[in-house]
Amino acid sequence: MEYGKYYLIIRKIAQLVFPKYKAPQFEPTDKPVVYVSHHQNMFGPVNVLLWYPTFRRLWGLSVFIDQQACYDHYVNYTFTQRFKLPPFIAKPLAWGVSYFVSRLAQSARVIPVYRRSRQIIRTLKESVETLQAGASVLIFPDIDYASDDSEVGRIYEGFLNLEKYYNRKTGEHIDFVPLYAKQTTKEILYGQTIRFDKDRDFIDQRDEKAHELQAELNRLANTEVEVDLV
């Protein structure tokens, strides 16, 4: 699998506008991984997707993949509640933006995330299939995704259930790799790989691993040096 032409064209145009970030020229391991990054009010997704050279599949809310659902989300929340636009402006704006965003998400091969729904199993299944096919997955688990703070606050832990599902399917464990777009140095940095302990129950270490990922991302936020990977 690879990015679609529409996404690649839009990305190439955007690269002419946005400041360039230096990305790693090698992968942290020879197998597919789950990259965990900091959202920072779209700063993280924009720069990682713009400047990271290799294919990876982003977790994104399911509403952004379907045009009608995307339109409803922009009209009922983003433009009216978050940006306080009046409906007569929000509706035509949402119509145009929803077509652009949904097509871009489809072309980028975004994995739909179904929050607060039993359909989340579809997200896990598609993610595991992606990893088994040799492609990596990219997740931005910030609870307060609208925060502009360079440091990571609380993160959702649900995405770590990928470990349990993947292990059940393959007998192997996932490498969770922190990935951070650093504004001050215009670099994309790897952190230390986080792995679950095969000799401990998953549920006993899920909270611990979430905190380790959060701490490693914040270490990257406050350092100028990329670490060695293990």
Predicted regions and their residues:
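Non-catalytic C-terminal accessory region of glycerolipid acyltransferases
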Residues: 115-230
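Short glycine- and acidic-rich boundary segments immediately preceding or forming the N-terminal edge
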Residues: 1-3
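Catalytic core of membrane glycerolipid acyltransferases/transacylases, capturing the structured
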Residues: 31-115
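A generic local structural motif
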Residues: 19-24, 44-45, 124-125
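Structured helix-beta-strand junction loops
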Residues: 16, 107-108, 133-134
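A short, well-structured juxtamembrane/interface segment
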Residues: 5-32
